[in-house]
């Protein structure tokens, strides 16, 4: 197997911005809010996309990309099928990690913490705000299960569309999760691979400890 350019030779010099303690927020949530809004303003493709890492009971990790749907002092929220692989792994081990990578801004945000389900009221409110096709899709897809072909999904969508018409209820197996952060890291690419990297660690009632890490 060969390619015109060696993968080992692919590299980029990061020179867009810097991340200094004096200019960063003392609260990581405020720093995240600033960076996310800057990614949106810069029209970064899907700035709300984040990688979610979970670990199974056999200690085997897995990742997938999900979309952030909200955040506040309580944590980071996304929605999914509770019976999916990630849902089953979170049921057995509630610790998880998230990562945002905004390539165009040469920035990465990493978040670690414990995950819990959001309330039924929150899940209901978000579910009913979704487009009709997406709500039907939550019923149609037995997420992470083996299926014989795409026709299974299309048949399920037709079946549930006919059953629920314009008012599908939220499936009991579908809803939201909230990761409650206890560790944040903000990475800003810099020249010569001497990147800026700030870590925030929760110190109980004392709040957040901000430290610079070597890249």
Curated annotation (Swiss-Prot):
User: Among its keywords, does the record have Zinc-finger?
Assistant: no
> Which protein family is it in?
Belongs to the pyridoxamine 5'-phosphate oxidase family.
Q: How is the cofactor bound?
A: Binds 1 FMN per subunit.
Protein EC:
1.4.3.5
Instruction: Give the binding site residues for substrate.
Output: 11-14, 69, 126, 130, 134, 193-195
Which reaction(s) does the protein catalyse, per the Swiss-Prot or TrEMBL entry? pyridoxamine 5'-phosphate + O2 + H2O = pyridoxal 5'-phosphate + H2O2 + NH4(+); pyridoxine 5'-phosphate + O2 = pyridoxal 5'-phosphate + H2O2
Q: By its UniProt entry, which Pfam families does this protein fall under?
A: PNP_phzG_C (PF10590), PNPOx_N (PF01243)
Q: What InterPro entries would the database entry show?
A: Pyridox_Oxase, Pyridox_Oxase_N, Pyridoxamine_oxidase_dimer_C, Split_barrel_FMN-bd
Q: How does it assemble?
A: Homodimer.
Function of the molecule: Catalyzes the oxidation of either pyridoxine 5'-phosphate (PNP) or pyridoxamine 5'-phosphate (PMP) into pyridoxal 5'-phosphate (PLP).
- Specify the pathway: Cofactor metabolism; pyridoxal 5'-phosphate salvage; pyridoxal 5'-phosphate from pyridoxamine 5'-phosphate: step 1/1; Cofactor metabolism; pyridoxal 5'-phosphate salvage; pyridoxal 5'-phosphate from pyridoxine 5'-phosphate: step 1/1
Q: What class of enzyme is it?
A: oxidoreductase
Species the sequence originates in = Polaromonas naphthalenivorans (strain CJ2)
Key words of the record: Flavoprotein, FMN, Oxidoreductase, Pyridoxine biosynthesis
Q: Name one GO molecular function term.
A: pyridoxamine phosphate oxidase activity
Task: Give the superkingdom in one word.
Answer: Bacteria
The lineage, from the top, is: Bacteria, Pseudomonadati, Pseudomonadota, Betaproteobacteria, Burkholderiales
Q: What is this protein called?
A: Pyridoxine/pyridoxamine 5'-phosphate oxidase
Which PANTHER family does this UniProt record tie to the protein? Answer: PYRIDOXINE-5'-PHOSPHATE OXIDASE, PYRIDOXINE-5-PHOSPHATE OXIDASE
Q: Which residues does the record give as FMN binding sites? A: 64-69, 79-80, 85-86, 143-144, 187, 197
- Cofactor needs: FMN
What's a BP term from Gene Ontology annotated to this protein? Answer: pyridoxine biosynthetic process
